[in-house]
Amino acid sequence: MAEASEFNFNLRRKSRAVTASRRVKEEVKEKQKMDDSKSQVVDVDSVSVYSHESSRSNYSDAYEKLKREPVVEESNDARYRTFEFSEDEETFKPANKMSDKSQRNSKSKHTEGLECSDTVLEKISELTLEIEKVKQMNQPITVDAAFNMTLRNVDNLTTRQKQALVNSIINSMN
């Protein structure tokens, strides 16, 4: 109902005056139904002056009027967003509205920011791919290649690591 201020409620006032003059009539009908236990049932039906058909047509007419109204580009929400509430005066003041040019500039800056982040993400993915390639190149392909690489790098191992390496080689031969 944020956009309720756009509607004309004069029709509703007229219908209130008409309905105030008319009274709702109530008819009580007693129906007797015979059940297996042969009990009596009393039904109360309330019937209004208006028929069901006419109330439907009123709604359909109102709906058609709403459909014929021109489409408003700017809703009430967008209109009232340009006002700021002043606490000291308890009123609404018009806010500084950005011009179309500044809005376009801010949108273009936003898209440039997205493009920059896209390029950064692309570079990061390329570098990650290169790191994976280097890791694969350093990984031994076969057991013999791993053995030869280990022997080449024996000088970098500590004494305990060398002892563990010799023990593992001896155990693998058994």
Curated annotation (Swiss-Prot):
The keyword Nucleotide-binding applies. Disulfide bonds: none annotated. This is Non-structural protein 5. One of its GO terms (molecular function) is RNA binding. The keyword Nucleotide-binding applies. InterPro entries: Rotavirus_A/C_NSP5, Rotavirus_B_NSP5. O-glycosylated. Belongs to the rotavirus NSP5 family. Keywords: Glycoprotein, Host cytoplasm, Nucleotide-binding, RNA-binding. Residues 18-40, 86-114 are annotated as: Disordered. GO terms for biological process: viral genome replication. It is found in: Host cytoplasm. Plays an essential role in the viral genome replication. Participates, together with NSP2, in the formation of viral factories (viroplasms) which are large inclusions in the host cytoplasm where replication intermediates are assembled and viral RNA replication takes place. Orchestrates the recruitment of viroplasmic proteins such as capsid proteins to these factories. Homodimer. Interacts with VP1. Interacts with VP2. Interacts with NSP2 and NSP6. GO terms for cellular component: host cell cytoplasm. Residues 23-38, 98-113 have a biased composition (Basic and acidic residues).
